[in-house]
Amino acid sequence: ADAPPAFGMCKACHSVEAGKNGVGPSLAGVYGRKAGTLAGFKFSDPHAKSGLTWDEPTLTKYLADPKGVIPGNKMVFAGLKNPADVAAVIAYLKSL
């Protein structure tokens, strides 16, 4: 699947190739994974201890308000304000 336009902000820091981390962790296979568990990437404590799983409800909230869902996380992204953009990014993440 092609990345939606809203994913442009994500790819500034995230790769979609397995094992290829950028400033942020690779998003390959992220859907369904427990937050903060990707091997080979140093997550912030708040992220690693969040206990979240990247499913549709969690991603919907997180992509709209990252700091509200995981206070103190290192991601310098304010969130997607358009629900259609959030849905498009989640659909893309499911395909990775």
Swiss-Prot record:
InterPro entries: Cyt_c-like_dom, Cyt_c-like_dom_sf, Cyt_c_1A/1B. Pfam families: Cytochrom_C. Keywords: Electron transport, Heme, Iron, Metal-binding, Photosynthesis, Transport. The keyword Electron transport applies. Binds 1 heme c group covalently per subunit. GO terms for molecular function: electron transfer activity; heme binding; metal ion binding. Changing residue 62 to F: In about 30% of the molecules. Heme c binds at residues 10, 13-14, 75. GO terms for biological process: photosynthesis. Gene3D superfamilies: Cytochrome c-like domain (1.10.760.10). Disulfide bonds: none annotated. Belongs to the cytochrome c family. Cytochrome c2 is found mainly in purple, non-sulfur, photosynthetic bacteria where it functions as the electron donor to the oxidized bacteriochlorophyll in the photophosphorylation pathway. However, it may also have a role in the respiratory chain and is found in some non-photosynthetic bacteria. This is Cytochrome c2 iso-2. The lineage of its organism: Bacteria, Pseudomonadati, Pseudomonadota, Alphaproteobacteria, Rhodospirillales.
